[in-house]
């Protein structure tokens, strides 16, 4: 599992020419309705209602977040959370538009700095695009979610997940990101038959070059299954595939 802080020459909002990123229509996946319930965000799928992978993984950082909220106070914590969430949404949309060969809507200098640093990485590594913001689910895992990007990254098919941060991250701080991307790898293969065995976590960082973490699906499956089991147990839910929890997933 590697982390690289990458910069490439050039600063521009669009590459020259049209159809800069080539899109490959592999499978048309049906949209999934998402609802908010007492146990978090849930997607309605043809095989049942499954919790969002982000909801499942959020419980892993709950204690640390609660300690932070007590330390800084509810008012400041709410403000920081809103600001972070809004920025993340904006940066995700900019990256999505850019990969769709549209000019991103950039409304602040800080957003511009972060997006353009990530854009340089996208320019250098993204090849053929298999899909963006695809709704995914797995009956085997009993989860669902929406993946940011599936593409050829430096010539090999990969899941790409965008994140934003106010500061640089250490590898040990992003275990949940690795589990989330692993879940997308498994869900995509289950729905399409196309295996994806690697992923990229691209993190835009305030006033810093972006960070790029690389990982392999099979290195994170056991941790992912433990997280899913913890969520189902905590909420007294019945899993559609109980045998999953003997770590038989491969």
Please provide the spans of the model-predicted regions:
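Mg2+/Mn2+-dependent nuclease catalytic core
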Residues: 130, 134-237
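Metal-dependent nuclease catalytic cores that hydrolyze phosphodiester bonds in DNA/RNA
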Residues: 2-144
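Generic preference for flexible, low-structure residues
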Residues: 107, 111, 148, 212-215, ...
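DEDD superfamily 3′-5′ metal-dependent exonuclease/proofreading module
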Residues: 4-24, 153-154, 158, 236-250
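Detector for Asparagine
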Residues: 15, 19, 66, 78, ...
């Amino acid at each position: 599992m590697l982390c690289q802080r990458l910069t490439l020459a050039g600063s521009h909002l669009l590459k020259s020419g049209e159809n800069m990123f080539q899109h490959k229509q592999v499978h048309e996946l049906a949209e999934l309705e998402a609802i908010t319930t007492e146990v978090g965000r849930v997607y309605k799928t043809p095989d049942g209602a499954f919790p969002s992978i982000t909801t499942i993984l959020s419980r892993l950082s709950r204690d640390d977040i609660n300690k932070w909220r007590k330390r800084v106070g509810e008012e400041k914590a709410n403000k920081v959370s809103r600001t972070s969430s809004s920025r993340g949404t904006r940066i995700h949309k900019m990256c999505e538009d850019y990969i769709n060969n549209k000019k991103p809507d950039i409304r602040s200098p800080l957003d511009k700095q972060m997006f353009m640093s990530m854009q340089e990485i996208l320019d250098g590594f993204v090849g053929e695009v298999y899909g963006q913001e695809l709704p995914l689910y797995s009956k085997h895992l009993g989860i669902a979610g929406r993946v940011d990007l599936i593409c050829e990254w430096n010539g090999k098919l990969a899941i790409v997940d965008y994140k934003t941060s106010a500061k640089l991250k250490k590898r040990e701080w992003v275990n949940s990101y690795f589990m989330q991307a692993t879940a997308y790898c498994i869900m995509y293969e289950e729905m399409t038959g196309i295996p994806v065995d690697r992923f990229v976590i691209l993190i835009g960082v305030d006033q810093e070059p972006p960070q790029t973490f690389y990982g392999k699906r099979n290195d994170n499956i056991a941790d992912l299954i433990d997280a899913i089991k913890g969520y189902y147990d905590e909420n007294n839910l019945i899993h559609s595939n109980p045998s999953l929890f003997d770590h038989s997933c491969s």
